[in-house]
């Protein structure tokens, strides 16, 4: 019988700063060549599990270990980080933290340079893997000239050059647009087939990541593995709900249509599922018997008006925003989508006054252009995509209280507001923690809390749900809905097709700095041309409709949205 390449035996790990173990009594074997998906809610222990494998624990991050861990038949606790790096390669979630070269080529060649590889061989290796990861045309580009997805591919190429038998990817989809995320998963599958390496992908976005190419799924909850099974069997069980992870939308739709999912052989393969005549009959019957009217209406009173707004970063570059015409209406929840580099974040920064613009911005029929950043912040709050670019305090409480203190509010009033927001964002238990101890997703919630506590008229959130598990996703979105009901206008820049379709009444699509669509979310996702231009990817509901043969897929999507909202309100 094949020996496992990774073996945990009664393994537990506890950080020095915490009162209880983050990993508890882990027993699992992973075999050479397996492709394993590791999922779990934020703080469930999945990243700690990965860091125990790659050696960041205990060689960089200290803590108490009990039990045994063997990597490639070696006791993992007595080797060193250098030796471990020859066996395990890791692509981090935060690509900025992993990019160390001045160009893409230099970054990919870093290991080869340190191993004194001949320059000709070095160039051949870099070119070979750059071709494999789709970066051959970008080898001379600086990191600041690359998108998040491109940086990720550079990091992957640098790891593949080392040809480690184990490859770990931590949240590879977190900062990518849907189409790029789909391409990344396809790339990883091709690499797995070619290299036969053991591949471990840590992710919580099941809609995008889970398919039947995974040999197994490890599901974490509260530091324990509560499921170790095939993708299909996991989807049939109740374990995802127990762990606070959202199942793929098509699985929920099948249940709404009263399909017995436990009787389906390969539930992880949507095409196979939809070949069943019974499934086709049940779904079509559900559509015919249920109204799919769209009750989302945005208000007619403009709050913010952008007229021919342009942004150009230098005299020699093309416009990042090009004659943008856009109205934002009072009390609406607006989603802004588009490919990486489309100008979404630039648009938000232009509204906030971070960038020089040409054109005109009006707020409540008043000129906005002449207001300073500080003055605009009274009306508009902005949560950036990367939390590390916003955080300036060491402690969580102090970070959330920072803006209120700058405005001179009494400390007693600050305490009430800060603690209320921390509870809503699921951070109250960590209020006295150092920010350095938080995961990327938890840091994201801290930055959201630091803006929500200021109570601005308009709240702009750049990827508000990136890195969030389903539980905290719902917590944050429920809070934003409540703010919206109280009269706040919410603008969400997102790659999340769930958020787009379920929580926004209107969607603006950007491509190459221009508005290419401004309509309802369902109509955006039903337009294949718009999806292609903006690097969007239709959800599994659209794929289901096409496989089943439904002539108007938007009916199924709108029906699901309406029905799901009713279920969540109950």
Swiss-Prot record:
Gene Ontology annotations for the cellular component aspect, listed alphabetically: ATP-binding cassette (ABC) transporter complex
Domain of life: Bacteria
Location of the protein in the cell: Cell membrane
One Pfam family in the UniProt entry: ABC_tran
Membrane topology, record value: Peripheral membrane protein
Domain ABC transporter: 6-247, 304-537
Enzyme Commission number, as recorded: 7.-.-.-
UniProt enzyme class: translocase
InterPro entries cross-referenced by the UniProt entry: AAA+_ATPase, ABC_Co_transporter, ABC_transporter-like_ATP-bd, ABC_transporter-like_CS, ABC_transpr_CbiO/EcfA_su, ECF_ABC_transporter_ATP-bd, P-loop_NTPase
Residues that bind ATP 2: 338-345
Key word Cytoplasm present: no
Gene3D superfamilies hit by this protein: P-loop containing nucleotide triphosphate hydrolases
Key words of the record: ATP-binding, Cell membrane, Membrane, Nucleotide-binding, Repeat, Translocase, Transport
Keyword Transport carried by entry: yes
Family membership noted in the UniProt record: Belongs to the ABC transporter superfamily.
Role noted for this protein: Probably part of an ABC transporter complex. Responsible for energy coupling to the transport system.
Name recorded for this polypeptide: Putative ABC transporter ATP-binding protein SACOL2708
Organism: Staphylococcus aureus (strain COL)
